[in-house]
Regions:
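Cap/insert and terminal regions of metallo-dependent hydrolase folds
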Residues: 67-165
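Cofactor-binding loop segments of dinucleotide-utilizing enzymes, especially the Rossmann-like FAD-
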Residues: 61, 135, 168
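Short active-site-adjacent helix-start/loop capping segments
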Residues: 3-6, 140, 173-174
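Beta-strand->loop->alpha-helix junctions that form or flank phosphate-binding loops
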Residues: 16-20, 158-169
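Alpha-helix N-cap/helix-start and coil->helix boundary motif
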Residues: 2, 86, 170-171
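Core dinuclear metal-dependent hydrolase active-site scaffold
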Residues: 20-78, 174-176
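A generic structural signal for alpha->beta connector loops
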Residues: 13-16, 29, 127, 160-162
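Active-site HxH/HxHxD metal-binding segment of metal-dependent hydrolases
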Residues: 1-24
Length: 176
């Protein structure tokens, strides 16, 4: 991530660059855990934040779902997850074949179907809200991402669960 944004934020001294993997961090009773996600960039991590019995889980740049990701998203009150592309839009869209294969590959991104299936696998009574993010402008629409997840929730009798699409403007503050 730093390599991508360093031109915008300037140089950060090496002593201030700390990539902490597989370590729990506690800040004012908030427990922050990280977990590796499969992506073609270096050191991509997902995070869980736990405070006073509440849990928020965040995962983006997820090439494929594995048990580590599932275990970390389980028992969440809120999940923030990428829903990057619609398979049909990707395959018929403007990207060249190499990039299409990269996006849908094991080190690429989650499709709407894959993100929705993952949410279906980690559903629990605690889960109140799902934020869908990192939605491709070329290969997806917010409506397709939303509808894909809504179909899974409806099938599981969880259609009351809140779904929100995150765009560049961000979101309102959500209290768990």
């Amino acid at each position: 991530t730093y390599n991508v944004i360093k031109d915008r934020i300037g140089k950060i001294g090496k002593k201030n660059l700390n990539f902490i993997r597989d370590e729990k961090i506690v800040i004012d009773n908030c427990v922050i855990n990280n977990f590796e996600v499969m992506h073609d960039a270096e050191k991509c991590l997902g995070y869980t934040f736990e405070y006073e019995g509440k849990k928020l889980s965040y995962a983006s740049d997820v090439g494929c779902v594995n048990n580590i990701i599932k275990e970390n998203l389980k028992n969440s009150d809120v999940i923030v997850l990428e829903s990057n592309y619609d398979y049909n839009m990707l395959m018929t869209g403007p990207y060249h074949w190499e990039l299409k294969n990269r996006v849908k590959g094991r080190n690429g991104h989650l499709s709407n179907a894959e993100a929705s299936k993952l949410i279906g696998q980690v559903l629990c009574e605690k889960l109140k809200k799902v934020y869908l993010m990192h939605i491709s402008k070329d290969n997806n629409t917010p409506e397709l991402a939303y509808n894909s997840l809504y179909q899974i929730l409806e099938r599981e009798n969880k259609s009351h669960l809140e779904i929100e699409i995150i765009n560049e403007e961000g979101t309102e503050i959500y209290k768990i």
